[in-house]
Regions:
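Active-site residues of response regulator receiver
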Residues: 52-53
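Acidic, metal-coordinating helix/loop segments flanking the phosphotransfer/catalytic sites
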Residues: 30-48
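Two-component/phosphorelay signaling modules centered on CheY-like receiver
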Residues: 11-29
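His-Asp phosphorelay/catalytic-motif detector in bacterial-type signaling
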Residues: 45-47, 73-78
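Short amphipathic alpha-helix used as the core "switch/output" element in two-component signaling
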Residues: 39, 62-75
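Conserved acidic carboxylate
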Residues: 8
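Alpha4 helix (beta4-alpha4-beta5 surface) of REC/receiver domains from two-component response regulators
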Residues: 60-63, 85-108, 115, 119
């Protein structure tokens, strides 16, 4: 069973995604901080990461994505960047224009449609 690391500081979002992911036969580990996410990444075999961009308590998701992709041990792990940044800030992110600067495989805007999420995961994991 493929293992997904889901990182978000919103516990409600994590719980909703966990139900969706487990229903689709994925093993899910969760982190509400970047620090905990790093510890999980070091100790478990992760197949895919879902990462919130704007984390309130820690370094943001952009920095964590760069850490993952610059590390030989983890750079093969696909990352889905999940965010509401376009809804809650004046910063407007456009994946077509700005995506080349991000070390992630997919950008998905919250709220994420469950069917789109599963289809994206299957595509990234080549299932």
């Amino acid at each position: 069973m493929k293992k997904i690391l889901d990182i978000d500081d919103d516990i409600d979002v994590l719980e909703a995604r966990k139900i969706i992911l487990e229903h689709s036969n994925y093993d899910v580990v969760q982190a509400t901080t970047i620090k905990v996410a790093g510890e999980i990444l070091e100790s478990e075999e992760i197949d895919l990461i879902i990462l919130d961009v704007m984390m309130e308590k820690d370094s943001d998701g952009f920095n964590f994505a760069q850490y993952v992709k610059m590390n030989e041990k983890f750079k093969h792990i696909p990352i889905i960047l999940a965010t509401a940044v376009n809804q809650i800030s004046k910063f407007k992110f456009n994946i077509e224009e700005d995506g080349n600067f991000l070390p992630v495989e997919k950008f998905m805007e919250k709220p994420i449609d469950p069917d789109d999420l599963i289809a994206t995961i299957k595509g990234l994991l080549k299932e």
